[in-house]
From Swiss-Prot:
It holds the Pfam family Bac_luciferase. PANTHER family: CONSERVED HYPOTHETICAL ALANINE AND PROLINE-RICH PROTEIN, PTHR43244. Residues 1-20 form the signal peptide. Keywords: Signal. The lineage of its organism: Bacteria, Bacillati, Actinomycetota, Actinomycetes, Mycobacteriales. The keyword Signal applies. This is Uncharacterized protein Rv1360. One of its GO terms (molecular function) is oxidoreductase activity, acting on paired donors, with incorporation or reduction of molecular oxygen. SUPFAM superfamilies: Bacterial luciferase-like. Was identified as a high-confidence drug target. The keyword Signal applies. It comes from Mycobacterium tuberculosis (strain ATCC 25618 / H37Rv).
Length: 340
């Protein structure tokens, strides 16, 4: 599905504001194509402002910003300003989060996530169109309504295209909707190459076909866990950390279908049970070598670049490696090989 495109290499921008600018500068200096923030314990947008200020080429994105914690007007505003300030380099990556977080952490409504996300993106684009072309804003949907936009609240038109919108998706319905309405897809680390090729890619292609769009206008991005080390001890430690991370993801109902695709569906209830008991060590012990290899790139440092390419080329367009418990020296060496 990735065709003959050059595989883009992306990196992470820390959400701590004091570190964001230096990290973005380092990514650009070292030849990375994009830098991404995540929404966890800090806001995902503020670091991108600093990154935009200190770089000129690096694509800048959120992976992800929680859409349902906000409304389309709020996201349209911050996306518009970041797109203008970065001179057209923003990728607005949106995700749904899960019901407990939306309702109990953000105190926002939940329901029909694929339909709601589709409408969220449509509302964003209606707002941006009103700002850019002066089109009357008259968006009324099932979940969102935006009908007032007076000159006082209308930002200036900009010389750049509206921000690209990527959607995080794992399930078929959300992935197909992503292919239909978004500019790109954000893949989760708990997605194997088999799941990508057998489930995600066909769903994306169905969505693209329904929208009548060409594949060349769409990007597929994926985070990939990497377990490596300078020696056997470091590699073993990285593998242990990666097994724990896979087990944590596998305990979450959202990723049960990924396990089922490999015939490992029975593992989910046990991981879920152990997670409720806080038995994290025991959970990691249930992830065997076959499972580890399905969800992560594993091996000595000098094998990582080739393994990443083998996993991603022809399937995805850009990769964000997530190194588990690796030294910075190992990370630098592996990524230097990748960029050659």
């Amino acid at each position: 599905m990735g065709g003959a495109r050059r595989l883009k290499l992306d990196g992470s921008i820390p959400n701590q504001l004091a570190r964001a600018a230096d990290a973005a500068v380092a990514l650009e200096r070292n030849g990375f194509d994009g830098g991404w923030t995540a929404e966890a314990s800090h806001d995902p947008f503020l670091p991108l402002l600093l990154a935009a200020e200190h770089t000129s080429r690096l694509e800048l994105g959120t992976n992800i910003a929680v859409a349902f914690a906000r409304n389309p007007m709020i996201v349209a505003n911050v996306g518009w300003d970041l797109q203008t300030y970065s001179k057209g380099r923003l990728i607005l990556g949106l995700g749904t989060q899960i019901r407990p977080h939306i309702e109990k952490r953000f105190s926002m409504p939940w329901g029909h996530p694929a339909r709601r996300m589709r409408e969220f993106v449509a509302a964003l684009r209606a707002i941006w169109l009103a700002w850019q072309d002066g089109t009357k804003l008259c968006f009324e949907g099932e979940f969102y309504t935006h009908k007032i936009m007076t000159p006082m609240f209308t930002p200036e038109p900009q010389p750049y295209p509206v921000p690209r919108v990527f959607i995080a998706a794992v399930g078929e319905a959300m992935t197909e909707m992503c292919g239909e309405v978004a500019d790109g897809h954000l893949g989760h680390p708990m997605v194997s190459k088999r799941y990508l090729t057998e489930v995600s890619v066909p769903a994306l292609l169905r969505g693209l076909a329904r929208s009548g769009r060409d594949r060349s206008a769409f990007e597929v991005s994926c985070e990939v866990m990497v377990a490596t080390g300078a020696d056997d001890a470091e590699l073993a430690a990285a593998c242990t950390a990666t097994r724990k991370q896979i087990a944590f993801y596998g305990s979450t109902p959202a990723y049960r279908k990924v396990l089922e695709q490999h015939g490992w569906g029975d593992l989910h209830p046990e991981l879920h049970r152990l997670s409720k008991l806080g038995e994290w060590e025991a959970m990691g012990g249930l992830i065997d070598d076959e499972m580890l290899g399905a969800f992560a790139v594993v091996g000595p440092v000098d094998t990582i670049a080739g393994a990443l390419r083998n996993r991603c080329e022809g399937v995805v367009d850009r990769v964000l490696p997530i190194f588990m418990a690796a030294s910075q020296e190992c990370i630098n060496a592996a990524l230097q090989d990748f960029r050659r």
